[in-house]
Amino acid sequence: MIERGKFRSLTLINWNGFFARTFDLDELVTTLSGGNGAGKSTTMAAFVTALIPDLTLLHFRNTTEAGATSGSRDKGLHGKLKAGVCYSMLDVLNSRHQRVVVGVRLQQVAGRDRKVDIKPFAIQGLPMSVQPTQLVTETLNERQARVLTLAELKEKLDAMEGVQFKQFNSITDYHSLMFDLGIIARRLRSASDRSKFYRLIEASLYGGISSAITRSLRDYLLPENSGVRKAFQDMEAALRENRMTLEAIRVTQSDRDLFKHLISEATNYVAADYMRHANERRVHLDKALEFRRELYTSRKQLAAEQYKHVDMARELGEHNGAEGDLEADYQAASDHLNLVQTALRQQEKIERYEADLDELQIRLEEQNEVVAEAADMQEENEARAEAAELEVDELKSQLADYQQALDVQQTRAIQYNQAIQALDRAKALCHLPDLTADSAAEWLETFQAKEQEATEKLLSLEQKMSVAQTAHSQFEQAYQLVAAINGPLARNEAWSVARDLLREGVEQRHLAEQVQPLRMRLSELEQRLREQQEAERLLAEFCKRQGKHFDIDELEALHQELEARIAALSDSVSNAHEQRMTLRQEQEQLQSRIQHLMQRAPIWLAAQNSLNQLCEQSGEEFTSSQDVTEYLQQLLEREREAIVERDEVGARKNAVDEEIERLSQPGGSEDSRLNALAERFGGVLLSEIYDDVSFEDAPYFSALYGPSRHAIVVPDLSLIAEQLEGLTDCPEDLYFIEGDPQSFDDSVFSVDELENAVVVKTAERQWRYSRFPTVPIFGRAARENRIESLHAEREGLSERFATLSFDVQKTQRLHQAFSRFIGSHLAVAFEADPEAEIRQLNGRRVELERALATHENDNQQQRIQFEQAKEGVSALNRLLPRLNLLADDTLADRVDEIQERLDDAQEAARFIQQHGNQLAKLEPIVSVLQNDPEQFEQLKEDYAYSQQTQRDARQQAFALTEVVQRRAHFSYSDSAEMLSGNSDLNEKLRQRLEQAEAERTRAREALRGHAAQLSQYNQVLASLKSSYDTKKELLGDLQRELQDIGVRADSGSEERARIRRDELHTQLSNNRSRRNQLEKALTFCEAEMDNLTRRLRKLERDYHEMREQVVTAKAGWCAVMRMVKDNGVERRLHRRELAYLSADELRSMSDKALGALRLAVADNEHLRDVLRMSEDPKRPERKIQFFVAVYQHLRERIRQDIIRTDDPVEAIEQMEIELSRLTEELTSREQKLAISSRSVANIIRKTIQREQNRIRMLNQGLQNVSFGQVNSVRLNVNVRETHATLLDVLSEQHEQHQDLFNSNRLTFSEALAKLYQRLNPQIDMGQRTPQTIGEELLDYRNYLEMEVEVNRGSDGWLRAESGALSTGEAIGTGMSILVMVVQSWEDEGRRLRGKDISPCRLLFLDEAARLDARSIATLFELCERLQMQLIIAAPENISPEKGTTYKLVRKVFHNTEHVHVVGLRGFAPQLSETLPGTGTEDASSQAAG
């Protein structure tokens, strides 16, 4: 007999009035007695709080608040506590004699909401000697103690050996421990379970009939038929899973590429990146090596460029220095040429001016003669005009006088006067005072003779004058010529100087004639000298370029040597070209072959992958195509054998399934028709009656009843006789046994038990011998055992069938794979490895590249040598023709000598050019210099005197002529004579006047004309003199300028200066061109050096970066490789055919796969997050993690009972193999799993019958319970009418509603709900789904209606309601119902908990004074009979005779409240005994904490 667990004590720490109080609880009834406010309700509240520490439920209201849904804000708990740490602990001893202390730590939370903080805990393994108050308090002195905090309590308990302390964060865990240890009767899994438990405690505490409990008695009293419900749920779950699997298979069949897509895209995504990183790593290594090679090459190039830069800079410096000298020389040559040209122009001007001066001098001399002649003529014309004028005047005067005399009779007197005047003038002119008119004629002849003499003398002097003047002009001309040539000199030195000048002129003219030959000779020599200098320069440059000094004699030999070297290098270059062509051709052939192999490699690799897969799948090694075809024939034979074995295993599995189905019939009937027949005849199957027989007794009873073990037990056989008529739907043998199904026994037979057999005497003359069956199936235990063994066999058969089916499918797919391989890859699979040949060819290609590089280097060096040799030969070709010049050492001296001679000749030429004309003029007149014509001036004076004398004589003769002509006038004596004589004279005078006037007019015109001509001649002469003087002055200036220029100007000097300037210009241009070339080359070299420096820095940076990248990538790659190898995915990721794709192609492939994967994993949060993380290009290992996550995800989705592999790829392949087989198998399984509606109705009916029987048993326990007028209490259980109709339809008329139960779209629960709605259309189902309604209809509790009835006085059985009962009757009735609930919970919990634990039973009752003594005695009797503990609270007038009573008195001591407690155990027949732990708490008011 298992002892029931008991609550030993209740401990309150720091509650209002209780500092540290422990209440020992009685095994039956503990009574708390005391007045109002003594602390009874506080004590019970502490107990309830320790049992249910749920603040959402706890509500300690006063009795006056009964029925209220909301009381004070703190719900009564805050005010029952003191400040600080508080405890409520229960000390329990369970059925296993384990001491457990459970409780809660409470603490008020500051604030207006008056909240309380609760922490549940449990203590196990506590020694019996340790009191609860000792655990949570610490004694400070004799009158003071302190409450420990929960942490201090834990530390204290941890120090105690064997004591376990547990603190709970959830109430569920707390109640789970209490249920497992037998402290509470029911497992409180949820808040609703805790609510039910609290409502039970609350109903017990406050007494009466709780409407909350009576309205839901089914939930409290009727246990959940978890087995049946679980069976239905498992069946539906299996069906649902089956249908979901079928749907998944259909989805998989319709979207067969789902997994393939995910794994293929994941493989493409990761493998492409994996291979790209592998390729990049190889490329980076190659780049690093290439960078290093380029770095070394660039360093060499930079050093070579630096050497080249130094040479060119040195050469440029030389050219810059030479350019300055050449520029100076060129500028000097240009200036010299300009000076020569200027001198030539000056010389031309001088010559032109000299010619002009000579011409002007001639013209001047001629003009002087013309002017002199014109002057003489002018003088004559003037004298003639003057004479004519005088004659005209005289004639006019005479004529006037004659006219006047004629006019006034005085003409004779006038003429006489005029004659006298003429005589007087003649006397004056002739100095003849004695002159008379008569002697005038004589004197006229004298004076005419004198005039003739003067004229002749004048002519003689004029001739002499002309001769003297000519001699004087020649002397002056010669003297001026000598002075112009020699400079100022004395006149007496002119003759000797002129002779010297003429001799020197002859010499100078001889020298001047040699200028042109000397100039030509000098030009030739200078050209040779320049060629010699050019040759020396070329030789110096040649030696400089050759880096060695060569003598002139060595140049011809060197030329031959260089010619031979050029020929050899030319042959070498041509041979090198052919060799290079051969190497390049071989390289191109290798490259073409490598390209071809690289194109063929992916095909070969695909064939190898397919071949490797075939080898892995078949476990064979194939070395030729013949092996493949032979193995394909073996596969066909193996497939036929596997199909035969699979069909045999399938037949046996079907037989086992049929047997399992037969044994799984409700009630143990092997024929489903027996259940319907049993219901029809109102009986019970014998197998159902013996359903509880043990497995050990099953063989006996199976043998006992033999064939009748499937009989139907009916109360009366006579009642079924009529029903047997026309019975066709039944087994061949149908047995009936008469008996009471409730009290059936096996006494209907006479039986003798033998060893493993029985002899049944069915009649006096009929015995039956039955051996115990080897595999009994009579009774639920035997059937379950047999079903279990059949299930085990079925599992084996199913596994074998699945294995064989998988093998068949695998063989078929392997056959298909071989067929595909033969069709696609057989032609190339067994060819040589192209990658090995590629590696070999790459090695050869590297050798060729190295040979080409070496060859190019050698060829470059040969080309340089060839170019150097060509340059040397070219320089020698220019040098060799000038070897004689190089050997001529006297050339410069000869040039100097000729230059001196040329200078002398040019000086002479300049002298002749300057004075040649003067010497030529001087030579014919040089003799006039012997005598100096000094008398020329005296002659000029004589000539002037003679001229004046001749003029005076002419005037005197003219005056005498006039006197002679007027001699007649002296004889006028009278006027007649005068008139007659004057008339002729007048006529003559008039005639002479006309003649004289005509002569005067001619003389005047001649004079004017001659005067104008003389003026013109004088103007011409003045102009000629002015021009002569100007040109002479300009000539002097030009000669001075020519002397100032200091350049000898001749016909060849300009050409030589120009040639020299052009040569220097050519040299300067060549120098500048070379300098520009050098500058450009230097700039290019510097740029190349800068480029090389930058490139070198870039290469160094790139090399270091690439090296760091390689090192970093190596670490990352090692991590990736480690992860790949650890997860075994290298075979999937290292796809060698991807190595032949470019990085862009691989990146594109990865990006495309990434886009597809984003869509594929959009609904999977984990894979989506991992995929998002894997997109980081700097973390390639995350892509491996994603691939592993995909594999893991697919592995988790692989059903190991279907597909036996961890590899998702193989799983996908196996999945395709299993799809068709699973579809067929699951379809048949669904048909087997589907339970019939009749079976459901039978199960629900049997469950209802069983629970009705159990309620009847509970009612028997309450028959003797009475409270006041209530004599008995019972529970009435009835089936609802609507649900009874549903059961009838399910049993009898289910064929009419097969459209619901045969629908694949509806679960059984939904079909059941649809049927219920179809049968009861008037019922409103609300918002509930058919699935929810169907699940409720599968719960038998929803078919029942329960109500509490009491047998009260004369009213008989009435429905128990608070309004119809008194307070005491209601309390007693309610307590009875609660006892039934607790007992029902224990029965339910017994199936969930160990059977060796009997839980504690405890109820409360507050304000028990409302019960009378008989009712209280009934409670005590009920507690004793049911082994239940009861805590009641009553005023002091309640004094029960049994149990333990605590009297509580609240006192005030020093302004502090405390409760004085005295405990008594019994008191009527026994002596009073003070319980331990009671007495006044003297120190409670002074306690700290």
Curated annotation (Swiss-Prot):
Pfam families: MukB, MukB_hinge, SbcC_Walker_B. Residues 326-418, 444-472, 509-602, 780-805, 835-919, 977-1116, 1209-1266 form a coiled coil. Residues 666-783 are annotated as: Flexible hinge. GO terms for biological process: cell division; chromosome condensation; chromosome segregation; DNA replication. The keyword Ion transport does not apply. The keyword ATP-binding applies. ATP binds at residues 34-41. Keywords: ATP-binding, Cell cycle, Cell division, Chromosome partition, Coiled coil, Cytoplasm, DNA condensation, DNA-binding, Nucleotide-binding. It comes from the Bacteria. GO terms for molecular function: ATP binding; DNA binding. Homodimerization via its hinge domain. Binds to DNA via its C-terminal region. Interacts, and probably forms a ternary complex, with MukE and MukF via its C-terminal region. The complex formation is stimulated by calcium or magnesium. Interacts with tubulin-related protein FtsZ. Plays a central role in chromosome condensation, segregation and cell cycle progression. Functions as a homodimer, which is essential for chromosome partition. Involved in negative DNA supercoiling in vivo, and by this means organize and compact chromosomes. May achieve or facilitate chromosome segregation by condensation DNA from both sides of a centrally located replisome during cell division. HAMAP family: MukB (MF_01800). The hinge domain, which separates the large intramolecular coiled coil regions, allows the homodimerization, forming a V-shaped homodimer. This is Chromosome partition protein MukB.
